[in-house]
């Protein structure tokens, strides 16, 4: 008895399905990395402006919208980052906002080490941005409370 052979149309269907799945995962990761880099650069720029211009910069997250405000120059920048899933950063002025000064963020933080922002893709991939009390913006999780 000869072994069964796959019909060409089934083989093409399976290969197209695998290619579509690989493309979907690559596209999802690309969106996550693009939004991560955009948010990371936004926070680093806010910290740099606060440090070198000796001013206060307020970063507010309202859902998927991020607003950066410099009260001294009345400059406001608003951008949308669709993959923001959670902002875990509380200040004395309110929730979901980060206030950068030339000394960092500790002056307005409610928690000792700062907080984090989580970005989650459609397929569930996650990346975290941690902003600590000195205003340093790094990739990673918020440290556990001590």
Explain the meaning of each model-derived region.
Residues 2, 21-146:
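N-terminal helix-rich module
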Residues 1-20:
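Glycine-centered recognition micro-motifs in short, flexible terminal segments and loops
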């Amino acid at each position: 008895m000869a072994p069964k052979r796959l019909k060409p149309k089934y083989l093409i269907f399976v290969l197209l399905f695998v290619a579509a799945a690989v493309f979907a995962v690559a596209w999802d990761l690309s969106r996550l990395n693009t939004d991560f880099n955009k948010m990371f650069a936004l926070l680093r720029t806010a910290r740099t402006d606060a440090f070198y211009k000796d001013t206060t910069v307020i970063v507010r997250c309202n859902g998927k919208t991020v607003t950066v405000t410099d009260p001294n120059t009345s400059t406001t920048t608003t951008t949308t980052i669709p993959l923001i899933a959670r902002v875990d950063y509380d200040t004395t002025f309110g929730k979901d906002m980060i206030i950068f000064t030339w000394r960092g963020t500790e002056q307005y933080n409610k928690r000792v080490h700062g907080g984090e922002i989580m970005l989650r893709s459609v397929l569930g991939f996650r990346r975290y941005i941690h902003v600590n009390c000195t205003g340093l913006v790094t990739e990673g999780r918020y440290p556990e409370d001590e």
